[in-house]
Amino acid sequence: MDKNKAVINFLLSCDYVRNSPLFYTLGQVEADNKQVVTLANDVSVNTPYIDGSVKKRYTFTLIDYQTVTPNAVITREVDNTNVPVSENLDNAFKVQQVADWVTEQSDLRRYPDFGSDCVIDDMVVVTDQPNLNGVDRAVTPVLAKYSISIRIDYIDYSKAIWK
């Protein structure tokens, strides 16, 4: 199984991702577009076992473009409580929801399908909140580039001498 396609299929099962354009490696920089970029896999993690199987790591980043405004955070009273209101806070929260969804899937042991020769041990979001990688003021509307990185550790049994 192609691991890149498996990750795309997995992400498309998340409502927030499925309802927006998703690109692989290269995409259009527009509000609400998402992009999957694979990272160089850490070969130092490759641990061969006596049966021929190998522990490996697959890491990717999900980039999410969201609109941003220079407006200050304001508060509104809701049910006798002051609640912060900000488009920027709301948009960052959208990206956080994907990170939370991935963590929830991992807790339930629902992983991308890497095929019958691979068994996923763990899937983690590398940071506890999205990274803000920059703001593009050259476009209208102004866009923020948020990202979350996800690491998948798995055992590759494709060369194992017994299974």
Language-model-derived ranges and their functions:
Residues 23-34:
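Short secondary-structure junction/hinge motifs that connect adjacent elements
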Residues 32-42:
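Charged, often glycine-rich, active-site loop that binds/positions anionic groups
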Residues 1-25, 44-163:
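Charged, amphipathic alpha-helical segments and their flanking helix caps
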